[in-house]
Amino acid sequence: MHQADQDFNYWWNTSGPWVEEPNVRRSGTSGVQRVMHNGTTVYVKRQTGHLFRSLKYPFGRPTVLREGKALSKLQELGVAAPQPIFYSAKKIDGVWQGLLVTKDLNGFQDLDTWYDNGGQARLSEHEHLQLLERLATLLAKMHLGRWQHGCMRSKHVFMKERNTAAGIEVELALLDLEKSHGRATTLRAARHDIPQLRRHSYWSVAEWRTFLACYEKVLGQPLGSDVHANVQPRRRALS
């Protein structure tokens, strides 16, 4: 048996508590388990018959291969995201099985949960503006590499607080990159992700102006007046 097959079989047969229970998506199944490996926590995504289709792959290609490639590309661009340890796919009796193994982002949580749990109240106004500027810089760096997230929502941005002598600082990372792929130009990537993020985030118009000003400064070009048009912020659900 080749080493690649041995590695695939090893990861396929690991087990641990479910982080995402197996569910049916894209006419296939997908689930994620938290697994201990050599004393560290990793996340193992297993998929069966879970494919995406494109002009290049009209008959379908395992989604984990696109996501693994995206994570590797973000590493190359210096954009924080889970580090891929292993990803591969193979056909068993005519059905694709796919694997993606990533390192744990220890201490991170998604932005929506952080806001809903009162995270913003722990920051000064200046610190919160810094959070928006850090996110703007992170996304601009990805788009300058002509790469788009593809499903840009605030819940797919993960953050971690750090107490420093100067106050609270935040680290940011991007997750859920199943739809992520390269684009022909920076602007195409930007004009896909940024309006999508606007529709699926809670920030006020004023906060978005701060975000966009920083984003366009790093990007080095404007996105267009339509992106700057005021959009009603998504409302938080009442508890």
Regions found by a protein language model. Name each.
Residues 152-164:
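Hydrophobic residue at the +6 position relative to the catalytic HRD Asp in the kinase catalytic loop
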Residues 169-238:
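C-lobe/activation-segment region of protein kinase-like
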Residues 92-96, 162-170:
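Short, solvent-exposed loop/turn segments that connect beta-strands within catalytic domains
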Residues 37-41, 165-172:
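Active-site beta-strand-loop-beta-strand hairpin of nuclease catalytic cores
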Residues 59-62, 127, 138, 189:
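Alpha-helix N-cap and loop-to-helix initiation/capping positions
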Residues 73, 77-80, 108, 114-155:
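Conserved kinase catalytic-core helix
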Residues 11-111, 140, 144-145:
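Conserved ATP-binding subdomain of kinase catalytic cores across diverse folds
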Residues 1-13:
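N-terminal presequences and immediately downstream first alpha-helices
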